[in-house]
Amino acid sequence: GVWLAVLAFALLPVLGVGQYTIQWPGTWCFISTGPGGNGTNSRQNWGNVFFASDFAILGLSALVVTFACNLATIKALVSRCRAKATASQ
């Protein structure tokens, strides 16, 4: 399930939705966030915006899930420490 979704997202540029562009100094690439170069049509620009937006939403979602899991862990550890402290008294 998750692996198929990740594969589908990674293949979007191959299918023509969004694109990667080479970044300076030419040793790495990243998603294109703006209109392309010569002759880029509005469909390609829409694809770039869609892919960049999805990329950002997935990244922010991962950040929120990580933060929520960390908060749950902190809450569990604090309650466990408090329970041990009251049990030892």
Curated annotation (Swiss-Prot):
Domain of life assignment: Eukaryota
Self-association state and partner proteins as the record states: Interacts (via C-terminus) with MKLN1.
Keywords, sorted A to Z: Cell membrane, G-protein coupled receptor, Glycoprotein, Membrane, Receptor, Transducer, Transmembrane, Transmembrane helix
Subcellular location: Cell membrane
Protein name: Prostaglandin E2 receptor EP3 subtype
Its membrane topology: Multi-pass membrane protein
Gene name in the database record: PTGER3
Broad class of where this protein is predominantly found: membrane
GO biological process: adenylate cyclase-activating G protein-coupled receptor signaling pathway; inflammatory response; intestine smooth muscle contraction; negative regulation of gastric acid secretion; phospholipase C-activating G protein-coupled receptor signaling pathway; positive regulation of cytosolic calcium ion concentration
